[in-house]
């Protein structure tokens, strides 16, 4: 069958950072599996393949205008259009692509997948009248089964892991088992997109690095139970990973074929299996591969040790991000449910500084169950890590993503201060955020003020550190001037 997979344009609101221009890895994996099984597949990245910026009411849209998407669909004549919807804040753009596809030809089958629709499949189908099918969870073999079912004219009810319309009713099928052997997946179908758009930073003005870089995922699933996280809804709680050989062969492939110089490991639990990741580092070192790599999604500090960190540094690690979330141990244990020892965080931060590894950390404030003093303790912890171990602070406000324990807690407790919309989710994820949660212990405004003051203190501290380390500052300014420009701009906006 002829299949067109679409990454929709993306929207951002006043105060939001411009969405990052990464490879649509989910679509590339689906395309690879479909091609392997004889289907004719093309990909339309309507975000990255067109740099148009246009206004739509209160939001700004980046990417291909609707008329161009319409022309591409007409030209490619797909029987099935698959649409990616990774974030709740972008749901309107996914629906718009379905609308366009049905406008071109009502016979086109529209299939939507991603974290948002996995969390709320029936709700999405009720809202998106032009979407025919929703994929719940992993998409590669669900999409293949949908196509095979259509070709054989079989009942979609027999395809696990989907929801679809049956007249006026919405049918949700039995859950699809999670893919156990990730090594059976072919490499993403890189040949279906213009790789230079993603690899060459000069084509993406808002990137802060200069090397040719590519995103990669080496594992799926998370066995932990953080209240705010939705990864288990679309990737499961069972940790599954590619073998060390598969990962290093994959890295070698993108280095040799696409001249990639930096790998962004986008895993949710990259080092959960420390033996596996040590083997990956060993193989990179043994093969003499000249590649840098980073962990933008964060790693757990309790899944690291000095031996592994040394090998990570030797194998090309340039920076590590930690998912710390709170600097208050009680909040971590009883509110978030992260089961992370802050003493271990400090130990790992110290080792990273000794090894010369750049580090950053993610923090979140504004959870139900927190009080002002808990939030302030998180800020103080973050500032101490910055002052003592050069760990950057990336502060967010708690966001009740649909399908998470946090969302259910907020819904049942009446803590969500307004109707949930694409805009409210987008604004909640902005730097310093526009909080969506209010409890008897804090208002949304109080959380925003705490976050704003914390960022001001962090910037002042960072400025002092830069003044005390001029050589390091000049090196950064030379190698990554956009980071310095952004930092200077932030000082004036504080």
Predicted regions and their residues:
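Radical SAM enzyme core and accessory elements
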Residues: 2-5, 79, 404-410, 415-494
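N-terminal [4Fe-4S]-dependent radical SAM core
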Residues: 3-4, 9-17, 159, 165-215
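Short catalytic helix/loop segments, enriched in acidic residues and glycine
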Residues: 21-34
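Radical SAM [4Fe-4S] cluster-binding motif and immediate context
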Residues: 22, 183, 189-365, 380
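Glycine-rich beta-alpha loop elements in corrinoid/cobalamin-binding modules
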Residues: 33-34, 40-181, 399, 403
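Flexible glycine/acidic-rich beta-alpha junction loops that bind and position SAM and/or redox cofactors
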Residues: 50-52, 118-121, 167, 224, ...
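Proline-aspartate-enriched helix->loop->beta-strand connector
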Residues: 77-81, 260, 387
């Amino acid at each position: 069958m002829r299949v067109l997979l679409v990454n929709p344009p993306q929207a951002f609101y006043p105060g939001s950072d411009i969405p990052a221009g990464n490879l649509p890895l989910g679509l590339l994996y689906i395309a690879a599996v479909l091609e392997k099984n004889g289907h004719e597949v093309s990909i339309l990245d309507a975000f990255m393949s067109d740099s148009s910026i246009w206004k739509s009411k209160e939001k700004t849209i980046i990417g291909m205008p609707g008329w161009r998407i319409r022309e591409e669909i007409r030209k490619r004549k797909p029987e099935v259009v698959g649409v990616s919807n990774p974030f709740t804040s972008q749901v309107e753009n996914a629906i718009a692509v379905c609308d366009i596809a049905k406008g071109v030809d009502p016979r086109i089958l529209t299939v939507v997948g991603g974290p948002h629709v996995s969390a709320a499949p029936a709700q999405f189908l009720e809202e998106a009248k032009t979407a025919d099918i929703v994929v719940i969870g992993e998409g590669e073999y669900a999409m293949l089964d949908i196509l095979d079912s259509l070709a054989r004219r079989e009942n979609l009810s027999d395809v696990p892991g989907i929801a679809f319309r049956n007249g006026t009713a919405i049918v949700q099928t039995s859950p699809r088992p999670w893919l156990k052997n990730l090594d059976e997946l072919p490499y993403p179908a890189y040949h279906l997109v213009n790789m230079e758009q993603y690899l060459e930073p000069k084509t993406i003005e808002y990137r802060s690095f200069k090397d040719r870089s590519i995103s990669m995922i080496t594992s799926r699933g998370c066995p932990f139970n953080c209240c705010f996280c939705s990864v288990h809804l679309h990737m499961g709680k069972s940790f599954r990973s590619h073998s060390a050989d598969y990962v290093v062969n994959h890295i070698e492939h993108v280095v040799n074929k696409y001249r990639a110089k930096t790998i962004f490991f986008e895993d949710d639990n990259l080092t959960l299996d420390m033996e596996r990741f040590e083997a990956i580092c060993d193989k990179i070192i043994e093969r003499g591969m000249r590649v840098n790599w980073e962990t933008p999604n964060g790693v757990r500090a309790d899944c690291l040790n000095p031996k592994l960190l040394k090998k990570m540094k030797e194998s090309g690690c340039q920076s590590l991000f930690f998912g710390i979330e709170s600097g208050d141990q009680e909040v971590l244990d009883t509110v978030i449910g992260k089961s992370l020892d802050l003493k271990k965080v400090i130990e790992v931060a110290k080792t990273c500084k000794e090894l010369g590894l750049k580090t950053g950390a993610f923090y979140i404030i504004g959870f139900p169950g927190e009080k002002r003093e808990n939030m302030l303790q998180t800020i103080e912890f973050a500032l101490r890590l910055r002052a003592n171990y050069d760990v950057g602070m990336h502060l967010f406000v708690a966001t009740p993503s649909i399908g998470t324990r946090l969302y259910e807690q907020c819904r049942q407790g009446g803590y969500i201060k307004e109707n949930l919309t694409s805009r409210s989710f987008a604004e909640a994820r902005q730097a310093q955020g526009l909080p969506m949660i209010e409890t008897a212990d804090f208002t949304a405004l109080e959380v925003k003020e705490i976050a704003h003051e914390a960022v001001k203190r962090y910037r002042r501290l960072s400025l002092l550190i830069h003044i005390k380390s001029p050589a390091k500052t000049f090196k950064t300014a030379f190698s990554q001037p956009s980071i310095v420009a952004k930092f200077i701009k932030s000082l004036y906006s504080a």
